Amino acid sequence: MVIVAGIDVSKATLDVSVSEGPVINFENSITGIRRLLKHMERESVTKAVCESTGGYERLVVSKLREATINVQVAHPTRVRAFARACGIEAKTDPLDAQVLSRYGLIFSDSNTARPESEPEREELRQLLSRRRQLMADRVRELNRLDKGLSTSTEKSTRRHLRWLDTEIERVDEEYKKLLKHSASLSDTAELYQTVPGVWPLTAATLIAYLPELGRWDGRVLTSLVGLAPWSRDSGKKRGNRSIRGGRGTVRRALYICAWVVLRIDGDLRDFYQRLRERGKPGKVAVIAVARKLLLQLNAVARRGTPWMKQHRNNCLPYQADPA
């Protein structure tokens, strides 16, 4: 029998409901989580569900997994849609905990939960997140230079830009060092980079944000990343197919790679040209190339062998007959 604890996570507290029962409040701290574990042991909890909150859930998720409790980190949008489907429009922390408990009982982990994060993978994820923050700050400062700043303000902006450039280089060195000194991550990064157009930063992004690569079916992965075109049909109406949702960090990385690969991979360039000749807009064709790249990477990760010439239909590495 599955007994599910729904955990609504905030910065300071954890609201917990077991099997949609009464909600108990714990501190979101080491001490509070110890109390939570004792409570879950008394209630014979076999599974815990919480939402992704941008980082506040990391401590409780890691401690629960250390205690060998199955943890599902659910997408907040899906949980909210589930609550509305159940007729629950109100939103409070205790109510969210009860909704999460019901959600975890109905939905399995197969397509909604990320695999357990290794410490090195989590560190890599945080380094890449910091890099994106610094890059966003750099873009903002560059945009300010076009606003007719006073001399002193312009000097301050340029000083900040120099600091940002130095800090970005430092973070780049850190994540590359992490990849180099981790046997498993290093091998995986080298394997991904055998696919044309995949560079070190892209490989690191895939390792950090798409641990399912090589474990799941290609169709499920394209949907997970947000590269699968969704239908919008009703009756006689046939709406436009469009992508939405998914892991934006991975999707953006593959989109950039797709532009690069069009210059160096003849097969994918021909594929792009065929789509353009059929009247597909340029960005739609590039997204299709990014989807192909993801399938190629999934084949490489699944087989654990470097990328070679591929069969078009199944994206499996072609192995020549031995001489």
What are these regions (language model features)?
Residues 277-311:
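Charged substrate- and nucleic-acid-binding regions of tRNA-handling and nucleotidyl-transfer enzymes
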Residues 99, 156-159, 163, 205, ...:
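Amphipathic alpha-helical interaction segments
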Residues 100, 134, 254, 279, ...:
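A residue-level signal for conserved active-site and pocket-lining positions in enzyme catalytic cores
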Residues 142, 147-201, 210, 262-265:
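Helix-hairpin-helix/helix-loop-helix acidic hairpins
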Residues 26, 200, 205-278, 282, ...:
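Phosphate-backbone recognition surface of nucleic-acid-processing proteins
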Residues 1-158, 162-165, 263, 284:
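Phosphate- and other anionic-substrate recognition elements at nucleic-acid/protein interfaces
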Residues 102-109, 139, 226-230, 259, ...:
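Non-catalytic alpha-helical coupling and interface elements of nucleotide-dependent molecular machines
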Residues 103, 124-125, 206, 253-258, ...:
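Short alpha-helical scaffolding segments that buttress acidic/His motifs in well-ordered protein cores
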